[in-house]
């Protein structure tokens, strides 16, 4: 009951940090059915392209042993080793391709789902992995029921397919008892192909469904409560590095927003290279000029550059520029102490427009 209530309280989507932490610990969505489909596909490729020739060679080898037993004397240990080595080599030549295919397709299916990464946490011993209580929850929980349903589905499908194939080839199956080894292997391969094709389609369907369900279940398990979101936010904002990064980002955004306001300015008051203050005055908007941008050094040069591109008058008055830079702030009206000096500059702007764009 407590576990259900805990899940119900997890109403928030997992944060990037929660997902990143889970990934670092090896907690990633992984569908075993995709691997099962890849293995089935590997076996089908083996049966179609390798098994026929391999089985024929194997049958011929066994045929020689059974039809010409006198050629294989077992008088000494050396004779026995020679016979066993012959059979083992023939068997190895037959099964080696399927092992290679299974490994390649198995690794490929894992990489398809998640890129490989070393995770020490997964190989460290933990009590909950051998705990009976934890095992009981895994078996009888939602995940356990889903796994049971998938296993039951595969057993039913394989059983039905095997019965139908053998029933369809009932007489051919009976005739195998009286056939030569080559015919027996050929018939078995034909039946095996039919079985694997149907199983391949079944596992493909199951793999697609399970792939989406596994990712959905993994995402749901990572969901967070509102309190967890608040705690994580406090923790991240409390980190000095994160705070510094946030302040830097905020300054960058404010600077970009301020620079974008320069074309709206009425005039620029500047110290030749160190300070620049952009003022906007429209009688219908405010009773006094408003500071739309200000900066020093490189920012001041940028303000002047934009102003000159937009035909905004630039007045070089070092004492006034320094004094205003120290006492005004962006998006606020200028203090009354500057009214007279700024009013004279605005009057010069109105008198000179549009002929004069820069006054020294």
UniProtKB/Swiss-Prot annotation:
GO terms for biological process: bacterial-type flagellum assembly; protein secretion. InterPro entries: FlhB, T3SS_substrate_exporter, T3SS_substrate_exporter_C. Its main location: membrane. It is a multi-pass membrane protein. Residues 7-22 have a biased composition (Basic and acidic residues). It comes from the Bacteria. GO terms for cellular component: plasma membrane. Keywords: Bacterial flagellum biogenesis, Bacterial flagellum protein export, Cell inner membrane, Cell membrane, Membrane, Protein transport, Transmembrane, Transmembrane helix, Transport. The keyword Cytoplasm does not apply. Residues 1-22 are annotated as: Disordered. It is found in: Cell inner membrane. The chain crosses the membrane at residues 36-56, 92-112, 152-172, 194-214. Gene3D superfamilies: 6.10.250.2080, secretion proteins EscU. NCBIfam families: flhB. Belongs to the type III secretion exporter family. PANTHER family: FLAGELLAR BIOSYNTHETIC PROTEIN FLHB. Required for formation of the rod structure in the basal body of the flagellar apparatus. Together with FliI and FliH, may constitute the export apparatus of flagellin. This is Flagellar biosynthetic protein FlhB. The gene is flhB.
């Amino acid at each position: 009951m407590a576990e259900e209530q805990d899940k119900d309280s997890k109403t928030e989507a997992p944060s990037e940090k929660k997902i990143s932490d889970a990934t670092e610990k090896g907690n990633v969505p992984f569908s075993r059915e995709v691997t099962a489909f890849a293995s089935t596909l590997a076996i089908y490729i083996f049966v179609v392209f390798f098994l026929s020739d391999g089985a024929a060679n194997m049958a011929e080898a066994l045929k020689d042993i059974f039809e010409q037993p006198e050629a294989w004397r077992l008088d000494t240990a050396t004779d026995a080793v020679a016979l066993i080595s012959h059979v083992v080599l023939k068997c190895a030549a037959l099964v080696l391709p399927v092992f290679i295919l299974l490994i390649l397709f198995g690794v490929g299916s894992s990489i398809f789902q998640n890129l490989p990464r070393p995770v020490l946490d997964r190989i460290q011993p933990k009590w909950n992995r051998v705990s009976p209580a934890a095992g009981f929850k895994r078996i009888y929980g939602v995940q356990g029921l889903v796994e049971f349903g998938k296993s039951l589905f595969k057993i039913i499908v394989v059983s039905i397919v095997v019965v139908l194939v053998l029933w369809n080839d009932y007489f051919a199956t009976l005739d195998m008892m009286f056939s030569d080894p080559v015919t027996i292997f050929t018939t078995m391969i034909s039946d095996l192909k039919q079985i694997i094709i149907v199983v391949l389609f079944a596992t493909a369907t199951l793999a697609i469904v399970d792939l989406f369900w596994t990712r959905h279940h993994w995402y749901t398990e990572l969901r967070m409560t509102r309190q967890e979101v608040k705690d994580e936010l406090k923790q991240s904002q409390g980190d000095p590095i994160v705070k510094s990064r946030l302040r830097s980002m905020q300054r960058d955004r404010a600077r970009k927003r301020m620079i974008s306001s320069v074309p709206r300015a009425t005039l620029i008051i500047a110290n030749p290279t160190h300070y620049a203050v952009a003022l906007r005055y429209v009688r219908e908007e405010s009773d006094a000029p408003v500071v739309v941008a200000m900066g020093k050094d490189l920012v001041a040069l940028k303000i002047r550059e934009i102003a000159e591109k937009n035909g905004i008058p630039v007045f070089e008055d070092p004492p006034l520029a320094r004094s205003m830079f120290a006492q005004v702030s962006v998006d606020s009206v200028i203090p009354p102490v500057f009214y007279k000096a700024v009013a004279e500059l605005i009057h010069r702007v109105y008198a000179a427009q549009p002929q004069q764009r820069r006054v020294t």
